[in-house]
Swiss-Prot record:
EC number: 2.5.1.129
Binding residues for FMN: G15, A16, S17, S41, S106, A107, G108, S109, R141
Single annotated GO MF: carboxy-lyase activity
Family: Belongs to the UbiX/PAD1 family.
Keyword rRNA-binding tagged: no
Annotated dimethylallyl phosphate binding sites: Y171, R187
UniProt-listed Pfam families: Flavoprotein (PF02441)
Protein name stated in the entry: Flavin prenyltransferase UbiX
Domain of life assignment: Bacteria
Record field: catalytic activity: dimethylallyl phosphate + FMNH2 = prenylated FMNH2 + phosphate
Annotated function: Flavin prenyltransferase that catalyzes the synthesis of the prenylated FMN cofactor (prenyl-FMN) for 4-hydroxy-3-polyprenylbenzoic acid decarboxylase UbiD. The prenyltransferase is metal-independent and links a dimethylallyl moiety from dimethylallyl monophosphate (DMAP) to the flavin N5 and C6 atoms of FMN.
PANTHER family on file: FLAVIN PRENYLTRANSFERASE (PTHR43374), FLAVIN PRENYLTRANSFERASE PAD1, MITOCHONDRIAL (PTHR43374:SF1)
Keyword match Metal-binding: no
């Protein structure tokens, strides 16, 4: 894969509920012609199979082939990395993309990233983005939040990390679960600076029913 940090991004899926968010975000990033390094935790594969019915092999190359077939995307735009692939570009500040999204992000991943852990490639990639002053978005899916969860998120926010709880809005009058997923993915794309038209934007011409 050729390295172009301006059109390259790291996406991580962890074991939190919300696999459809991560899959839809991947689809949109690829459609926007981004090269995506995808990091998948073992728990994320279980959640993806449970919530979406998509069973990915543990082998990174096989998982990549399965996703390319499932999404119908170009094979050269997606690289699935092993959880201990320390030779991956995302593991080094000299080669890693400047943007990273963890979606969905578990509370455990929030804690590990907040405290600089690098026990797997997801944590290391996040640590690299932080030390290189890149853009890190965490789409946290947990409820309720404990005091410890909130303290970890506050710590990360002070570091410049964008904390985006997976809490879709309803003012666009969603008609399906896909509409709710698109709302969150649209907000993520907005923060990444990627054009999107997944949901109508709020504006003065928007009518609110019931008035």
């Amino acid at each position: 894969m050729s390295m172009n940090n301006n059109r390259t991004i790291t996406l991580a899926w962890t074991g939190a509920s919300g696999a459809p968010y991560g899959l839809r975000l991947l689809q949109c990033l690829l459609a926007a012609d981004y090269q995506v390094y995808l990091l998948i935790s073992s728990a994320a594969r279980v959640v993806l199979a449970t919530e979406h019915g998509l069973k990915l092999p543990a082998n990174p190359e096989a998982a990549q082939a399965a996703l390319v077939e499932h999404l119908g995307c170009a094979s050269d735009k997606l690289v699935v990395c092993g959880k201990e692939d320390w030779f991956s570009p995302v593991a080094s500040g000299s080669a890693a993309p400047k943007q990273m999204v963890v979606c969905p992000c578990s509370a455990g991943s929030v804690a590990a990233i907040a405290h600089g852990m690098s026990d797997n490639l997801i944590e290391r990639a996040a640590d690299v983005v932080l030390k290189e002053r890149g853009q890190l978005l965490l789409v946290v899916r947990e409820t309720p939040f404990s005091t410890l969860h909130l303290e970890n998120m506050l710590k990360l926010s002070h570091m410049g990390v964008t904390i985006m709880p997976a809490a879709p809005g309803f003012y666009h009058q969603p008609q399906s679960i896909d509409d709710l997923v698109d709302f969150m993915v649209a907000r993520i794309l907005d923060h990444l600076g990627i054009e999107q038209a997944l949901v109508p934007r709020w504006g003065y011409d928007q009518r609110v029913r019931g008035e």
